[in-house]
């Protein structure tokens, strides 16, 4: 399971001209599901995302996690993160989870974050989305479990 996280000062997702999710300070999480992923990996990754210390403390050091910084999550499904780009000029998605598996784990990720009290907004699974963000830093990390 892969989470490409970006520290943002604001981000939103638009589907069919309508804003369906938006946050101010927080993390934009692009979430990719691989064939071998399960609920245990989802929980481990969600915990890591929420606990990862990427927000600056009073000394300017990246030392605060999402809760400590008073941030929110915007979680967007992104199956292309599971692409194999090692050969040729076209990505292969043979390692990506099935749509059913990905939908289940994406929703479980969102539900887990909500259950921990994190303000969590979402995109729409498998929709054509327009994602806008203001990357703060920029600060971007690729987390994988």
UniProtKB/Swiss-Prot annotation:
MF-aspect GO terms: D-tyrosyl-tRNA(Tyr) deacylase activity; Gly-tRNA(Ala) deacylase activity; Ser(Gly)-tRNA(Ala) hydrolase activity; tRNA binding
EC number of this enzyme: 3.1.1.96
Catalytically driven reaction(s): glycyl-tRNA(Ala) + H2O = tRNA(Ala) + glycine + H(+); a D-aminoacyl-tRNA + H2O = a tRNA + a D-alpha-amino acid + H(+)
Species per Swiss-Prot/TrEMBL record: Shewanella piezotolerans (strain WP3 / JCM 13877)
Top EC group: hydrolase
Swiss-Prot/TrEMBL domain comment: A Gly-cisPro motif from one monomer fits into the active site of the other monomer to allow specific chiral rejection of L-amino acids.
Top-rank taxon: Bacteria
Protein's name according to its UniProt entry: D-aminoacyl-tRNA deacylase
């Amino acid at each position: 399971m892969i989470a490409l996280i970006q520290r943002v000062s604001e981000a939103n997702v638009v589907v069919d001209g309508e804003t369906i999710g938006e946050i101010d300070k927080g993390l934009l999480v692009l979430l990719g599901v691989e064939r071998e992923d399960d609920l245990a990996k989802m929980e481990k990754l969600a915990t890591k995302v929420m606990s990862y210390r990427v927000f600056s403390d009073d000394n300017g050091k990246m030392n605060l996690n999402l809760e400590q910084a008073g941030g929110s999550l915007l979680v967007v499904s992104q199956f292309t993160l599971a692409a194999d780009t090692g050969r040729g000029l076209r990505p292969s998605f043979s390692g990506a989870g099935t749509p059913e598996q990905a939908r289940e784990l994406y929703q479980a990720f969102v539900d887990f974050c909500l259950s921990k009290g994190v303000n969590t907004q979402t995109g729409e699974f498998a929709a054509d989305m327009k994602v806008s963000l203001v990357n703060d830093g920029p600060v971007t990390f690729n987390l994988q479990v």
